[in-house]
C-alpha cells in the first residue's frame, strides 16, 4: 500500500462534498474515485453553494457516481469513505461504514448529539476500523502558527484570545441548515470550529458563559462565549448566522506580541511594541486539503490520528453543548 494512492469515495455531494472533492486534486497519498448522493441535482452538478460567500467547484467528470451509500460501497473497493452529508446523518452512515470495515473520515461536527458521537467511537473500537473527524482548523496554517506560538512560548504567555466566525444563513438541500434540530444552528455547525480550536490548544475550560439568542433556526444562531480558565488566558469566540458575507478572524495577545489573522488567512500579522508590522505568508492551501492529507498519511502508515483523535472531537461536542445550555439558561456552565 505504501506506493499506491488510497482510493476514496465521498458520501454527500452538496457544498461540503464539492469542497472536499476539490481538496483531493493534489493529494500525494490518496485520490477520489467516486461520489454518492441521493439527490440527482447535486450528484450531477459541477458546483455547489457553500456558506463562505460563493460556490465550490470540483472537477468531477471522471468520478464514478452513485445514487446511494450502498451502491457505492458495493461497486467500489474503497480504502476509505469521506462523509459530507447533513450533520444528523453523520453517525448513522459512519457506523455503517465502520461496521463494514471501511476507514471513515467525516466532516465536522462529529454528530448532532453526544450519544451519537459515543456510538461512532464504539463502532470504530468494536470493528477495529480507523475514524477521524475533520476539524479543519487544527490543520489551517494560521491556526497552526497560533498553536505553535502558544506551545513554544516564543512570544511569551498568552494573555487573551478572541475569535470570530460569521456568515450569512446557509441553505443546503431542502433548507436543512435552517432546521435547528438537524444542524444545531450556527453554534454547532459553524462556531464549533472555534470551540474545537480552543479545546485543541488550551484544553477543556473550567466553565463557559455564553450570551446568545435563537434567530432563524430555533437553535443558537448568534452567540459569544467566554471560556473560563483560572489564571487565564481570557478567551472568547463569537459566531453569527446573520445577513452579511462570510468572515473569520482571530486576535491573540501575547506578552511580547499580538497576532492577527483574518479573511481566508493566507497571511498573518505580528505586532510588536514600537516595531514595524511583520507579515507571515502562509500560502493558499486551507485546512480541508491538509486534514485529508494527514488522514491518508496516517492511514497508509497504520498510525493513530494523534492530532485529531475521535475522543477529542467528541469532547468538542460536549463543550459546544455546554455553550448551548449556557446561552439558553443565561447561566455559567461548569465542565
Give the location of each predicted region:
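Contiguous beta-strand/loop segments that form the cofactor/metal-binding neighborhood of enzyme cores
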Residues: 189, 195-267, 292-304, 323
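C-terminal helix-rich "cap/oligomerization" subdomain common to oxidoreductases
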Residues: 1-2, 41, 80-82, 118, ...
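Beta-loop-alpha module in the N-terminal Rossmann-like domain of NAD(P)-dependent dehydrogenases
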Residues: 20, 57, 61-123
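Short glycine/proline- and charge-enriched loop/turn segments
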Residues: 101, 174-182, 273-278
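Active-site loop of classical SDR/Rossmann-like NAD(P)-dependent oxidoreductases
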Residues: 19, 281-293, 308
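N-terminal Rossmann-like dinucleotide-binding module
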Residues: 1-58
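Hydrophobic residues in well-ordered beta-strands that form the structural core
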Residues: 106, 131-133, 237, 261
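Predominantly a Rossmann-like dinucleotide-binding segment in NAD(P)-dependent oxidoreductases
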Residues: 16, 130, 137-211, 216, ...
